[in-house]
């Protein structure tokens, strides 16, 4: 795709500053050790180069030289194939399929609740909180089984779960004692340098333990 955005020589991500979908892409970029340019977008006034690259103004949008992608799931799988070290999906087909199924379940069962948490109707927000709370409690044993979710190595699943878990307190979701493995897992994910660097200024303020850290990448506000 021609145009100013696709002619960029750097890896560029157009991102919202408070979006879980955008956050997981930022996290994958940094876990890969890449040096992207983050362009923080005001959705009420998207920059012309974003609209040129992605006429719908989709966020997140990734520009990697002449490749322009949107849809966070598509982007993170592209990044794992385009920049294979460290690998963030299993090397065997069966392992990759299991991880993709897990990603689909997380998106369907957990990420799908996020829009409801911002609704104006209190009952709707509480239903979403309870849905997230109950599903995380039900999966506590899986979080306890291995150092990372479903494996011994950091994967796209971990990069998908961590941004969601970071937002629990912000949305008023408290987990009960039986979900301690979830909180222990979350603490390990939050301690990773790439996670600390992936946080926007807005996301840092979502929790009391938000760091005053900045990504090792250039940032532009549009």
Where is each model-derived feature located?
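GST-like domain detector, emphasizing the conserved glutathione-binding G-site
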Residues: 1-136, 140, 216
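Conserved beta-strand edge residues that scaffold enzyme active sites
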Residues: 43-44, 182, 203
């Amino acid at each position: 795709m021609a145009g100013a955005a696709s002619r960029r020589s750097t890896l560029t991500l157009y991102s919202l500053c408070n979006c879980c979908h955008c956050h997981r892409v930022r996290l994958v970029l940094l876990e890969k050790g890449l040096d992207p340019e983050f362009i923080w977008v005001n959705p009420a006034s998207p920059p012309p180069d974003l609209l040129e690259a992605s006429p719908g103004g989709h966020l997140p949008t990734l520009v990697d030289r002449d490749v322009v992608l949107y849809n966070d799931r598509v982007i993170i799988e592209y990044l794992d194939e385009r920049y294979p070290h460290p690998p963030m999906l299993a090397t065997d087909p069966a392992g990759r399929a299991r991880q993709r199924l897990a990603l689909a379940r997380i998106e369907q069962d957990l990420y799908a609740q996020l829009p409801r948490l911002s609704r104006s109707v209190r009952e709707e927000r509480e239903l979403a909180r309870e849905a997230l709370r109950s599903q995380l409690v039900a999966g506590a044993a899986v979080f306890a089984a291995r150092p990372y979710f479903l494996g011994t190595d950091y994967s796209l699943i971990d990069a998908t779960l961590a941004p969601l878990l970071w937002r629990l307190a912000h949305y008023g979701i408290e987990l009960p004692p039986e979900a301690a493995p979830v909180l222990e897992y979350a603490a390990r994910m939050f301690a990773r340098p790439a996670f600390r660097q992936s946080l926007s200024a807005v996301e840092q303020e979502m929790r009391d333990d938000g760091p005053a850290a900045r990504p090792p990448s250039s940032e532009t506000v549009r």
